[in-house]
Each structure stands twice: as structure tokens, then as C-alpha cells.
From Swiss-Prot:
The keyword Signal applies. Belongs to the Sulfolobales SlaA family. The mushroom-shaped unit cells of the Sulfolobales' S-layers may consist of three SlaB subunits and six SlaA subunits. GO terms for cellular component: extracellular region; S-layer. It is found in: Secreted, Cell wall, S-layer. Residues 1-30 form the signal peptide. S-layer large protein. May form the highly ordered outer sheath. Its main location: secreted. Induction: Constitutively expressed. The level of slaA transcription is much higher than slaB. Keywords: Cell wall, S-layer, Secreted, Signal. This is S-layer protein A.
Amino acid sequence: MDLSTKKVISAGLVFIYALSLAMLVPMFLASNQGVISAVINPATGGNCLPGRYSGIVQASGVTLPAVNLSYVAPFTSALPLLVYSQSIFNGTLYYYNSTGSYELMKKYGISITPVHQIVNVTSRFFARTTEGVIPNTLPPYTSGNCYLFNTTPPTPFYYSYRTLAMVNSYFPNTQYINTSSEISDLYFNVSYLPYNTTLTLSIYATPALQGIEGIIRFNFSVKLCANSTIYPYAEYTLHAYFYFNNSFICELENIKTSIPGVASATSPTTIHFTSTAVNYILLVDLGLWSNVSTVYVTGVEGATYPSDTVATTINNGSFHPVIIPPAICIQYKTFYSNQINPELPNTSGPDSIPYMIANVTIYSPDDMLNWTYAQKYVGCIAAEYANPKWNPYCKINEAWYNNYGHGGNGLTVTLMVGNNKVLSINYPYLALCHVSYTDGFHNFVYKFSIEFLLSSVDNITYMLTTVAPNSTGLGGDMLYVLIKPCQLKDATILLTYNDSDYAVQHYFGPVDREIAVVCNNIKVYTPLLYMPKCVPISTPFFYGQVIDYDYGYNYALVGYVNTYYFNATSHQYYKVGQYVDVQHVSGDSELVLGVCPGYKCASLSIYYPNTPPYYPASHEAKVGKIMGICIEFANGTMERIYLSPSNITALLTTNVMKQMAPMPPFWNYSFEISITGLESILHITPNQALTVLNNSYIIVCYYDIASNSTVHNMTKLVSTPVTVAISPPSQAFYYAPATPFDDIVHPGCQIFYFVNVNATYPITVTLTDKSLGELSPTTIVTTTVTCIYVILYNGTMLHYNSAVFPITLTETAPSSGVFTATLYVEVTNSKGTPVTAYPLNYSYIAIYNPATKMQIIVGKLSNIMPLVPSKYFKVGVVVDGLSANSTFTLTEIPNVIYNVSPIIYNYIDGELSVTVAANIPGYYYSGYLVLTIYNCTAKPCHPIYTYEIYFNFSATSPHFVAAYDLLFLEPILNGHTYYITITAIVVPLTYEPFTTIGFEGKVFSGAYFFSAPAGS
């Protein structure tokens, strides 16, 4: 056979094998009825589906018991083949006999790739399988025939591929050289070969993939012949026949002039094999499951499946695989600003900080290990987890290792302090939670929560199924980070999630995207020591708070709490809102006080009543110190309270600071400072405390270990605002002086007249003292006036203490804190009796209340307070160290009596009349109205006549008509003008010598014309 013929045959073989390869592309038998209308992702409605996931195939006009899945890759890939063994058939040794000489032909040998090494085949692959389906009855995909199928079922796959390059066999002219290469360029090393010898070489190899069971056998049969035609040596012909799975025939022929010779030939090849385990991995390795692959879905008709005689649908649907690298999201619940500091506004913003708990969501759609997780059992929302196949706590720590060195070992949690790794654990369990809500299927994510707990030792532990996952998104395991308080400010939690999905590892491993890494830092804040600015001493105790970052125990963070609207027409739930919230699961922590050496400080340890696994047996960790509690008195004196056990119990009421319930926003613990206990430590009574502790400060100093900072605050103690008020009388005091007058009829005789004046006025004293009232909340409390004082107009002050007059202030009602008493100011004489027909210029002041009359003699007003108008004095009281006073004005009556009508003179009968009235009505007055006529029209001059008329007033008759009979003076009066005066003379009942007591109440003074008849 010549060389050209061989080339034609070789080209024909290439065509035949290319045609056979094309026929391996999935071809579907025609059906006259059924068609595939759609392939759907039930969660998204699209046609991109993850691996090991439940897809929906929708058919019409046919009932499908199964589907054919054909996986097609648009690119070539390298298939690694592992050589397991090799063998060779040793033929008979022949000797070559030539004329004149004998030569022994050496034993032949063939060398291939060493056993257990890898060779690669570059090829384009195809795979096909038949998989049963599950009828889908869950909305919304209920119209037509809808079936669930597994996108990557674990049933046996039929694979095929062809080599793109020709298989080359090369016989080099060397001695037993061992080499290795791709199977498309496999070397055979041959030395001197005998005549008429058949060589058989068997190579056992399999793809270096976990999904292949058994091995693939490659059989090579080599026959070499050499014939001698003439002597000496002539041409030798070498024929070689290769048999590969009865389909690969390569004729190797080359004519050389000597042995050994060199020959080579080429031919295409196609390989078929079946995989029965972990086909998902093999699909990935062969490029059949990638983000650019296509999977064709053909329905298998009839009820006789898996019979070989069933037909397939007339057409096919398709979907695209989707491979997504993992991602980690950390969600925090933040506080409002005023939860951090009550003085800040109630808003979120730069002042808001997160809780000490974080909810972690791991988005790894390709990492679901069971396709039935996406399916509910009956489609009932109330029983959505009735699926018997549902197992939200599947173990994900099933590592897959590939050539890139990354293993999908799930979540690794590492505690870093500064740049130092403290400890690290693998977190093997994660809860599946759905992030979207429909009637049938869900997209799932992994969820868990991280909570920091202060501890005396460092550790990372977890508690499984603290809250079962549910439709609200709440749930997942709780990961507890136990950390020493001094390390917290430099701590970082490093979360490393290595996706266990083989496709993610295969495609994203080379670029390190198969691993998601995030850091969870804890920001440590300087604590806030909150104490009220001012409290009354009468309060038994007052609250303080230690407010810091939330180190509280056992919270669960709701990542996405969904609010839904149900559409009655479509029977769908639509998500209308999401928010993040925190739920307090169980247990409140406490701060326990302990004593320090020397009793100068008190240690604070946090105690968790319900601790997670591996928490220290003491259940507590030291978090801070109360460095000191001091009292600063109003005068500036400072006294430190030693925090001995007895003083702690007395002053702080208890050695346990409770966590404020029900949901403290922070590490918020309350303590009570007992004022009663402080009084006992200082050895003072409650009444003494009202004075001793008034305007003093309680100062507390606190040291926080986590932030390494010291804060302090103080509270002022006051006897509550105490006020004393005096309500002055509504009218002023009056005094009415008098002047002695000698009766013109009886010279030298005293004429006595009466003036009755009520000079008693009430004064209300009001004391407001809430602290005093709370000393006995259920009974009425009384107190006494400490002092009464009088201040005269010239500044003279007269004091009178409570021993002289025990005036009592009585509380208006129990615990009201309002105390009242009524004092009276009255003008008295030197004998201490009220002024009633007594000399007004000898008036005195008496102060008393209705229960006890106490007269205070201040001396003669005529001596101490000159009898001039607009003079005043003050009466004041002192109660509880507070003073109040009221001013009393002394007003002189300018005229006791005044005229209310003009003076009228009747020249016929000589009568001069005038109507007068009392200047201060309502009192009884008596005396004389004196008319004096002077011998001139203007003063100074001498009186020529005096005439008096007796008068009196009463409370009911305040007016009086005075008529003077001047008929006997008519000759000298009529027709003339004289200066006259009309004066009211009011004379007291008693008279003390050498004292001016009289007074002229001027009714009229001036020139007056006495009229006369006309023409006279």
C-alpha cells in the first residue's frame, strides 16, 4: 500500500469518527404530542438554577415520569488521567542468522508514563442522564403539568469526549528512554526487535476525579515483522498494528534501510465512560457545569419508564447553571443617641452605636447539600416546615479538595487581639433561613449570631438551635465569643467562610473567591456613669446607672423581619417592609460588688446567670472598680467612705447591681445609694441630715477595664426647696395723736374724750419644706418658729426666740410639705392691753397667735418712732434657717374730723353751722368742735372769742352737724371779715404729765365774711 492510499484511508477515518462524535450530541426521539414549554427556577421565575437544586419543568399535552438531562459545554477542557498499571507481553526471543556471523537480538522493551502519574487529555465533553421527577402541586406553578427535577441528580451519567489532537506514537532511535506526556503524544521506546514477534501492551488509566468508579482500559497490540530478502543486508519492511478499544486503528509504517528504524503515524480518538458516584464533581471538572454551560431538558413520555421503549418529547427546554461565590453580611441593631446618653437627642446618626450582638448572614446559594430543602411539604404557610426532608441543621463541614489547595471546610471563626491570633475554631453548623417568601419555594441563606461575653478566659463556643429558624428570619445558632475585658477594645472577630460547593472551589478557587472573609470589630466606648443632679435628703435612696456597651446575656438578633401583604386574588404574600430588631431570649446579667484591700475601692464583676458551654465555672468576670465614694459638705469639707462590706451594704443597699429590664439598650446596670445608710455611716439623725447634708455632694468614681478609662459623677443633696412666706395685712396701721385743751369754762380741768380704734391685724406664715413633710408620709408633721424679730424704721432690730413664744406651724395634710400658722400684730399700751380708749401715742406692738398670746412690748412709739407720717416697722420670722418678713406702715391721721359742707352763717339768728365727718369711719369718736374768732383777717393776731360744741360719731352715724349760736356777737360780726378756725379736739381717757397728747383736727381755718342784711 502506497503512502497516498494510506493518507486517503486516514482522512476517511477522521471523517467517520467526526461523524460518530457528532451523533453523540443529545438527539431526542420525536413525539407527536408532548412538548416542553418552560424550565423555571421556582424562587426567581428565571431559568438560571444552582446545582443540587429543585427546578420545575413545565410540559403540555403529556405526562412525564422522567426527564433527560443533557449537559453541553461550549469550551474544551483538560481531562487528567491517572495511570494505575501497565503490562507487556513478552514474545519469544529469536536469533538472527546471517552468513558468516551470528548476532543475538536483544530483548525488546516498551516504556510508558510511570504508574500513578497524571497525563492530561484536552477535549470537549458531553454528558447525559435520565432522572425521575416529582409532580409539583404547589402554587404558583400549577397550570399545566409541572414537575420538580434535580438539576444535578446523583444517578449514573454517560460521558463521552473526543481528542482534538491526533494520537501520535513515536519510536525514537534511543535506548529505553522513560518519558511522559499527554496521551495524544505517548512515547514508545524500542530497541533491536526480532523478526516475527507480536508485542501486546496494556495500559490501565482513569480520570483523576472522585466521581469515577473503576478504571478505563487501554489495549495496544503491536506486531513487528522484519524479512531478509538478499544478502548482504537489503531493505526491511516494518508493519505495526495498534488496537484501542477496538475502535482506534493506527497503521504505523515506515521503510528504513536498517534496524532499528524510526516510524510514526496519527489518528483521532473518541472515549466513552460511565460515572456512578459524585457526578456533580465530574460535571464541574469536565466543564459541563459552569456559568456558560447549557443543560437541555427533554421529557420522557409514558408510564413505562424506565423501559427502553419510551418516547421523548418533540422538543426540549433548557436552563443555565449558575455558580456564585459566597458572601458574608453582618447586620447590627443600633441604638438611638439618647439611649447612649440621655442628654443626646433621640435620633440615629454618628452618636448611635450597635449592640454587642451581630447577626451574620452567609449567602452561599451553591452550598446547599440537598435539593429538597427548597421544597415545602404541603404548601401551607402555617405548616411550612412540615417537610419531612427538611433539616435546617445539616452539617456543612464536608470538605472538598481540589488542585488549588482550598478545601470547603465551612466557617472558621478566629479571635484576633491586635495582630495576634488568640484562638480559632471551625463552626460546623449553620442554620438555613429563607430570605424571600412565596407559597412554594424559598431562597436560603445561612444564619447565625455572634455575641460577645466578658469572661476571665478567652474562648469561642456555640450553642446549637438557640432559636429555631422560622418565617420571620429569626433563628440560627448562637456563637459566643468569651473575651477578657482588657482585650475587648483591640479585639477583632475574623469570619472565614470556605464554600464547600465543588463548582465554587473549581472556578473561583484560583482567584481566591471561594472564600468570604469579613471582620467584626467591637468599638469600645468610655462608659457613662449616670447620677441625678439633685435629690432631696428626705428621699430614702436614689438610683444611679453604669451605662456602657451592651455586654448583656443571651440576645437573638432578627436579621430581616418581614412584613407581608396577602393578595387574595393571586394567593401570594408580598413583602412590604423589613426592619432589624433584637429579642431578649432569657437571663439578665448582674454586677457583683466585691471588696478590695484597704477598703478604698470595690471591684465589679459581671455575672451571667445562664452561661453558654465552656464558660468559666465562676460565671463572672471582673469588669471595673468603684474607685471611691466621697461626701463633699457644703463648707467644702471632703470625707471618703471606706467601702467595707458593712458600708457597701448600708450605702449601696445591696452588693448586686441588677441589669435593667426588660431589654436594656446597653450594659446598663442600676445601683441604689441609700441616704438613710449614709446617715447611719455619718452617725446623724434624719432631722440633723436636713441641715448637715443640705447642699452637700455624693461623688462616685468608676474605673472601666474595657476602655481603660475613669469616669465620675455627683449628686447634690438638698432639703428640697424650702420657702417661708409672710402674707402682710391688707391695710396699714393708723395712729391719731391728741393735744391737751383747757376748758374755757373751767380752766385747768382736763376734758376727756373717747376714740375707739381696732388695731389688730393677722399675718399668715407659710413654710414649704417637702423633705420635712416626707419624714412621716402618713401623719401630719408640725414645726416651730425659730425666731420672731421686729425691725424698726431706723434699722433697730429686736429678736425674740421660740422659748418666749412657741408658735407652731402645722402641716396642711400628710406629706404635703406645706406648714402654716397665723400671727397677729396689735397696737397696745404700756400695760400690754389692746388700745381701746387709751392714748394712741402710747401704743405698743403685741405678736401672738390664737393659741398663745404673746405680747411684745417694744417701747413707746413716741420715743422710738417719732409721731410723723409714713413711718414703718417690719415683723419677721425665722424657720429652718430661712427668714421672711412683712412691712407695716404707720400712717398719721391728718384730721380726725373734716367738714363735708361749707360753713354757713345766718345773720338773722346769728347761727354758724357746718357738717363734719370722721376721717376714718367705722369707729366711735367723741369730743368738742372748737370755733375760734380772731380780731383780724389773717394771722398772727389774737383770738377774741372761743365757742365749743360737743360731738360724737359712731360706726352707724359717721356725720355730725355743728351749729354755733353767735347772735350775741351779731353787732360786731355782721358785715365784717374775721379769721376763724374750727378745730376738733379729741382728748384721751387718761393723761400722763409732761406728754403732749392733744391734737387739733382742723375742720376749717381762714378768713370768713359774716354776711349782713342789705343796707345795714
